[in-house]
């Protein structure tokens, strides 16, 4: 492979790593939370749905660890987790108890993710990450060797991402010292989890989808973000449904395009609680006697759904010792 080819491959891998470490909005299913109307409507054998539940109950990063366990081992360890979820020890898991557990799992995943990458950026080991440290760790080679990027497609990507990262870093830096504490760096990597970062999430989403640069998202841009029309055939039914969603529910003022407020309403709905929705879904699917609470037996009878949900951090909690949970 020629030197230029190797460089392009290396830069591509570097960029993929940079983007993987960040929490910016990307594809369709990362932008849109699942509406309540979908809960309880999917068939039990839907493996994709099970994966969603597993990620909710266990944690996305570690769901693959569930594959290490036999069904009997999974049920045994899941039973121990159920005892932790049942905070009042009455033998019944309520939707509220399940919701609080899922929120705990979500929060732990986020902070574990930050801990994994912290040392890569905290070069001077002072328990803070300055903007300069982050910039050098992420873009140092690009900044030091601009000529190598001049004619590559990566040049435009890095040139765009650097100021965007700086803008997000400054938004997360509440005291304005251009140095991030762990909490501030968590807000930088996971802005969707912090109220003061919501405007950045909206702005970055707009920039990602608004291809003609007019400051709005029209219907074609909205569809292009989730569907690549590579041939001249008819659009799938789900795309036609999304066009209807755009017209009926996304475009609130009916001007044919989405402004920032409409984008915010779309990707960050104020009346939607993900953990509450997932907890309701798990109860709905497992509550055999329809008393709106779950016994340990009901959960273990539907173990395959739970070990694939955020409540067990996608299986990670099943491989941990009891004291770690």
Curated annotation (Swiss-Prot):
Its gene name is Rcn1
- CDD domains the record matches: EFh_CREC_RCN1 (cd16229)
PROSITE patterns in the record: EF_HAND_1, EF_HAND_2, ER_TARGET
Which N-terminal stretch is annotated as signal sequence?
A: 1-23
Residues annotated to bind Ca(2+) 6? 287, 289, 291, 293, 298
Question: Residues bearing Phosphoserine?
Answer: 49, 74
Cellular component GO terms, alphabetically? endoplasmic reticulum lumen
What's one GO BP annotation on this UniProt entry? Answer: in utero embryonic development
Q: Family membership, please give it.
A: Belongs to the CREC family.
Note the Pfam families from the entry: EF-hand_5 (PF13202), EF-hand_7 (PF13499)
Q: Which SMART domains match?
A: EFh
Further details from the record: This protein has four functional calcium-binding sites; potential sites II and VI have lost affinity for calcium.
Q: What does this protein do?
A: May regulate calcium-dependent activities in the endoplasmic reticulum lumen or post-ER compartment.
Q: Give me the residues that bind Ca(2+) 4, please.
A: 210, 212, 214, 221
- List ligand-binding residues for Ca(2+) 5: 251, 253, 255, 257, 262
PTM characteristics: O-glycosylated. O-mannosylated by POMT1 and POMT2 and elongated by POMGNT1.
Q: Where is the EF-hand domain?
A: 73-108, 109-144, 160-195, 197-232, 238-273, 274-309
Annotated membrane-spanning segments are none
Where does the protein end up? Endoplasmic reticulum lumen
> Which positions bind Ca(2+) 1?
86, 88, 90, 97
Residues annotated for Ca(2+) 3 binding in this entry? 173, 175, 177, 179, 184
Q: What is its main location?
A: endoplasmic reticulum
Residues glycosylated per entry: 47
- Show where the record puts the motif Prevents secretion from ER: 322-325
Q: Which positions bind Ca(2+) 2?
A: 122, 124, 126, 128, 133
Q: Which UniProt keywords apply?
A: Calcium, Endoplasmic reticulum, Glycoprotein, Metal-binding, Phosphoprotein, Repeat, Signal
Name of the protein this chain belongs to:
Reticulocalbin-1
């Amino acid at each position: 492979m020629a030197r230029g080819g190797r460089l392009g491959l290396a830069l591509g891998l570097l960029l993929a790593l940079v983007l993987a470490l960040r929490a910016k909005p990307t594809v369709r299913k990362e932008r849109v939370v699942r509406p309540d109307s979908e809960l309880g409507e999917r068939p039990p054998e839907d493996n994709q749905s099970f994966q969603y539940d597993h990620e909710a109950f266990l944690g996305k990063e570690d769901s693959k660890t569930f594959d290490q366990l036999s069904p009997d081992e999974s049920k045994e360890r899941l039973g121990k987790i159920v005892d932790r979820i049942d905070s009042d020890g009455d033998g019944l898991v309520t939707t509220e108890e399940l919701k609080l557990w899922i929120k705990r799992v979500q929060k732990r995943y986020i902070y574990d993710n930050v801990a994994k990458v912290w040392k890569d950026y905290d070069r001077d080991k002072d328990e803070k990450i300055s903007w300069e440290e982050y910039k050098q760790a992420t873009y140092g080679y690009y900044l030091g060797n601009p000529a190598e990027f001049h004619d590559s497609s990566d040049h435009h990507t890095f040139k765009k991402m650097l100021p965007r990262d700086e803008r997000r870093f400054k938004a997360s830096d509440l005291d304005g010292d251009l140095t991030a504490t762990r909490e501030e760096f968590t807000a930088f990597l996971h802005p969707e989890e912090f109220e003061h970062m919501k405007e950045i999430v909206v702005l970055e989403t707009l920039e990602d989808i608004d291809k003609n640069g007019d400051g709005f998202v029209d219907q074609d841009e909205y569809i292009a973000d989730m569907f690549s029309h590579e041939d001249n055939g008819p659009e799938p039914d789900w795309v036609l449904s999304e066009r209807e969603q755009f017209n009926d529910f996304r475009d609130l003022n009916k001007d044919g395009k989405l402004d920032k407020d409409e984008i915010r309403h779309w990707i960050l709905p104020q009346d939607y609680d993900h953990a509450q929705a997932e907890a309701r879904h798990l109860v709905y699917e497992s509550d055999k006697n329809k008393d709106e609470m779950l016994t340990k037996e009901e959960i273990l009878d539907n173990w395959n759904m739970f070990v694939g949900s955020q409540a067990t951090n996608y299986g990670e909690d099943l491989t941990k010792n009891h004291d770690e949970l």
